[in-house]
Design a protein with these regions (language model features):
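Intrinsic-disorder-associated interaction segments
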Residues: 11-14, 55, 69, 110-117
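Generic structural motif
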Residues: 10-14, 83-85, 96, 106-108
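Short, extreme N-terminal segment that most often corresponds to the first beta-strand
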Residues: 1-45
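Hydrophobic, Leu/Ile/Phe/Ala-enriched alpha-helical segments that form helix-helix packing faces
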Residues: 21-29, 69, 121-128, 132
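Short, intrinsically disordered low-complexity segments
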Residues: 30-97
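Acidic, proline/glycine-rich low-complexity IDRs
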Residues: 1-4, 99-145
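Generic alpha-helix signal with a bias toward terminal, lower-confidence helices
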Residues: 19-21, 37, 42-44, 64, ...
Length: 145
């Protein structure tokens, strides 16, 4: 049985800019560079096809891409890896009112293969809150297929 898990958060009171949440995560041991030094993201003009790309992109260029996509009502998509571990998530968002973290990259699990939401709570939610990111609401969801 396969599992799909997501966390949905609202960071609107922290900032209305997605890039601000991304940069905060990058200061909290989360990297938008994968182990090969590439950024995995949804490119400009994707039209919700979710055709993820892997490229070497500077932080400045990534900021420009994210800002452009948000300003043009395009969905931002970015892979995050937790430094020093095999744990991560994909972030998708059109605004900071609803940021979806797909726990699909080396998903942390319990012995029965359900998602270890406590790991994500400690390493994402608590870190964000402790560093000034007010989270108005959050949900944890897990589905089986």
């Amino acid at each position: 049985m396969g599992y799909e898990a997501i966390i949905t958060i609202n960071c609107e009171y922290y900032s209305n800019r997605i890039i601000d949440v991304i940069m905060l995560l990058s200061k909290l041991n989360w990297s938008f560079y994968n182990s090969d030094g590439l950024v995995e993201y949804i490119p400009i003009g994707d039209n919700d096809e979710c055709d993820w790309q892997r490229e070497k992109i500077s932080e400045a260029d990534l900021k420009d891409i994210v800002d452009y996509k948000q300003d043009h009502n395009e969905r931002v998509g970015l892979l995050f890896c937790y430094n020093g571990t095999e744990g991560g998530f994909t972030m998708t968002a059109s605004s900071t009112k609803e940021i979806v973290l797909g726990l699909d990259y080396y998903r942390k699990t319990m012995p029965d293969n359900t998602t270890d939401f406590s790991w994500y709570f400690q390493n994402v939610i608590v870190l964000l809150r402790n560093n000034g990111c007010e989270i108005d609401y959050l949900t944890f969801d897990e589905y089986t297929d």
